[in-house]
Amino acid sequence: MKKSFRILFISLLCFSLTGLSFTIDTANKDSLKVVFLDDPVVAKFDSMLLANFTNSESIFEGSVTSPTEAPSYSDSIYTLRIEALNKKTPIDLVFNPYVKQYIKVYTQRRRTQMSRMMGLAAFYFPMFEEVLDQFDLPLELKYLAIVESALNPRAKSWAGATGLWQFMYNTGKEYDLKISSYVDERMDPYRATVAACMYFQSSYNLYKDWSLVLASYNSGRGNVNKAIRRSGGHKNYWKIRRFLPKETRSYVPAFIAVCYAMNYADKHGISPEEPKFLHYEIDTIEVKYQIDFQYLSKIVDISISELEFLNPAYKINVIPFIDERAYHLVLPVSKMGVFVQNESEIYNHFSALDALKQKSYPKYSEEDERIVHRVRNGEYLGKIASRYGCSVSKIKKWNNLKSDAISVGQRLVLFVRPDYV
């Protein structure tokens, strides 16, 4: 579906990120010695969690996981537990040394993070399961969002993959996720989940194997197809694994480990960090006029950070009103009555602002597209800017250029209007 690039690893003391280099225990003869250095899947997990979004006091009530005790079990116990999970799903769940290294990550080295994931899962998973069921897909696919985004709906990789399900710009467009100056529907939990399910369904129709569906979600179908050809035509993930990109080689083992960790967290002394909101405590209403969070927070007595958590798709804290697309406001059930009671007053307030032009909002328009331009002979920044309808200063900002000097073959990241692509 998309090329998933390795997210830059950010080291913060509060997360104790000291476990990225380790060797698998070789006490058992059947285990492998694996050097686990700056693993791309773990780096992604940490990077997503380090975002302020999942650390906000507006989301969690407080941690209950003890950071000291981290039980470990024999390979035979892990095998029995994963076999029990495997009987409940059509996705092939196996235990091997590659899976074991990620079980250690999630149950020993990232215990606090897993506690937060369990709390966020209580909020998001009921909706995931409902949509997965509508598409007749395995419910265990919900765990993939933990591997993808650490359940952060505003997660964004340096390559541009965005949201709970990490859609790239063009792939999001392909699955009808609108991106504008106001809204990025890749960050809309429900709409992005529907899009992810559409991808899962079409990918399964192609491969008839859920492990290959997972691999293709990470690296793209093209890379999976190439790996199948290079392996001699095998259509088993473990037989084509060595021909896949580095991150994808870790992706399915990490998924299996997350399935294990979420189902056996209690056996490892991990308890959920309770979220402030649960899925049955929120309600949704379609807006009938453009509104912003600042005024809304005063009317219904809710913090802006809580509005952002419940409504992550709105980029500048404004919910637009357009004829072509319905947009919704999500509020706690306890606040929805206040909104409905004051709905006319709220809309009249913004209507008056528009009439008096006291508040200026950007025009609703499709967002510029991210492209990469390779510098050709004879090109300079001014010429490139003219070609793509942007400014030299913006090109320098996008690419962290200190001067106007560029070289032939250099790659420049540009954000341009669709008509210039």
Language-model features: where?
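Bacterial Sec-dependent N-terminal signal peptides
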Residues: 1-31
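An acidic, Gly/Ser/Thr/Pro-rich helix-cap/linker signature
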Residues: 20-135
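Extracytoplasmic/secreted proteins, especially bacterial periplasmic and envelope-associated proteins
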Residues: 98-102, 116, 120-123, 127, ...
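Substrate-binding clefts and substrate-entry loops adjacent to catalytic sites
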Residues: 102-116, 151-158, 166-208, 228-242
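Solvent-exposed, acidic/flexible segments
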Residues: 110, 114-121, 125, 134-137, ...
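Short, functionally critical alpha-helical segments immediately adjacent to catalytic or ligand/cofactor-binding
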Residues: 137-154, 213-218, 308-311, 395-399, ...
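Extracellular LysM carbohydrate-binding repeats and other cell-envelope/extracellular binding modules
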Residues: 244, 310-346, 371, 391-421
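Primarily a LysM-type cell-wall glycan-binding module
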Residues: 273-304, 360-391, 402, 407-411
